[in-house]
């Protein structure tokens, strides 16, 4: 929105939740838009935008529930068919449903045989309940690192599109998202925000559920470097490449050196060491050593 406004010489005011990633804020401002932060969710930000529009006469561009927005995002579906004409399954990260609605409409128009799968974060999955109720249902609470798809309720348009055009709505856990983000960074050399890797997360979690050839739509790179580091570390722990150990050893010179020597001999890379001499769980004459290790995988971690 900010870039389009800049290219057209128009003014743009963008509303975001207070939890929006810093890179997203900075990039939006760099394109010349005014940014207002308000609330904890996209729903809160949308309500603030609508109040602003009512007071100023500005036009609201809905983040997902508008025919033009859905049509624009549908061009992704056209690109999928151009680049992978033999595709059998398209998997799309989904929040409010604008992207999957557009992709499904475009793909179905040309290839009605292609299976369309929407993927939501399991702690912010607004579509299952809404589809069951036959109307948008507001989630009572959301808690996910995937802020870009943390939407409390779908729109009327997107719910209708998903009901009529999407074959399945799947959910992924925070662990799945962490693993997928690590995979994208390490294997695909892509920096993607947690919301953008939801489709990849679904594929990695249950690859046999998707008929190949499969296209996973990777959408969104707005991630704070600090969060990226945390998620990558969490992902490494989830796949058995980070190992934390608490050891009780005799309180005498050389004990810590002996522990570290054993770990080095086992081929583990020591990332962090903490040494505690006092504590209710310690016996007299012993200390606790806490170590964080990098291993080559779950088998190596078990050996260590």
Predicted segments — roles?
Residues 1-8, 21-25, 70, 93-104, ...:
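Short glycine/serine/threonine-rich phosphate/pyrophosphate-binding segments
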Residues 4-15, 105-115, 134-137, 208-209, ...:
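A glycine- and small-aliphatic-rich helix-loop capping segment at beta-alpha/alpha-beta transitions
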Residues 5, 28, 61, 80, ...:
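Buried hydrophobic positions in well-ordered alpha/beta secondary-structure cores of metabolic enzymes
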Residues 8-11, 31-33, 55-58, 65, ...:
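Short coil/turn connectors at secondary-structure junctions
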Residues 13-89, 107, 120-173, 177:
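Small/polar-residue-rich loop-to-helix segments that shape phosphate-bearing ligand pockets
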Residues 56, 155-212:
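Active-site-adjacent helical/loop segments in soluble small-molecule enzymes
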Residues 65, 94-98, 120-125, 143-145, ...:
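Glycine-rich beta-alpha junction loops
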Residues 225-304:
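A conserved regulatory-domain signal marking ACT and ACT-like small-molecule sensing domains
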């Amino acid at each position: 929105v900010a870039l389009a406004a800049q290219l057209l010489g128009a003014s743009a005011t963008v509303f975001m939740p207070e939890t929006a990633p810093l890179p997203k804020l900075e990039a939006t401002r760099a394109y010349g838009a005014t940014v207002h932060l308000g609330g904890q969710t996209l729903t809160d930000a949308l309500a603030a935008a609508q109040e602003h529009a009512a007071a100023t006469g500005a036009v609201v561009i809905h983040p997902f529930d508008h025919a033009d927005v859905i049509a624009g995002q549908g061009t992704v579906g056209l690109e999928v068919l151009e680049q992978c004409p033999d595709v059998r399954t398209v998997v799309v990260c989904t929040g409010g449903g604008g992207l999957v609605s557009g992709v499904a409409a475009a793909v179905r128009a040309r290839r009605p045989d292609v299976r369309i799968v929407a993927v939501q974060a399991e702690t912010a999955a607004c579509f299952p309940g809404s589809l069951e109720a036959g109307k948008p249902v507001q989630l009572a609470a959301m808690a996910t690192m995937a802020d870009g798809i943390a939407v409390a309720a779908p729109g009327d348009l997107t719910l209708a599109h998903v009901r009529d055009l999407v074959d399945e709505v799947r959910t992924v856990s925070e662990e799945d998202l962490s693993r997928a983000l690590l995979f994208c960074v390490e294997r695909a050399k892509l920096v993607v925000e947690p919301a953008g890797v939801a489709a990849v997360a679904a594929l990695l979690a249950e690859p046999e559920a998707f008929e190949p050839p499969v296209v996973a739509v990777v959408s969104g790179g707005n991630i704070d470097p600090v969060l990226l580091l945390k998620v990558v570390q969490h992902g490494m722990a989830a796949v058995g490449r980070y190992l934390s150990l608490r050891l009780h050893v005799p309180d005498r010179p050389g004990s810590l050196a002996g522990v570290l020597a054993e770990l080095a001999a086992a081929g583990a890379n020591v990332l962090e060491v903490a040494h505690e001499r006092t504590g209710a769980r310690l016996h007299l004459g012993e200390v606790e050593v806490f170590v964080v290790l990098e291993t080559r995988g779950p088998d190596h971690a078990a050996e260590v």
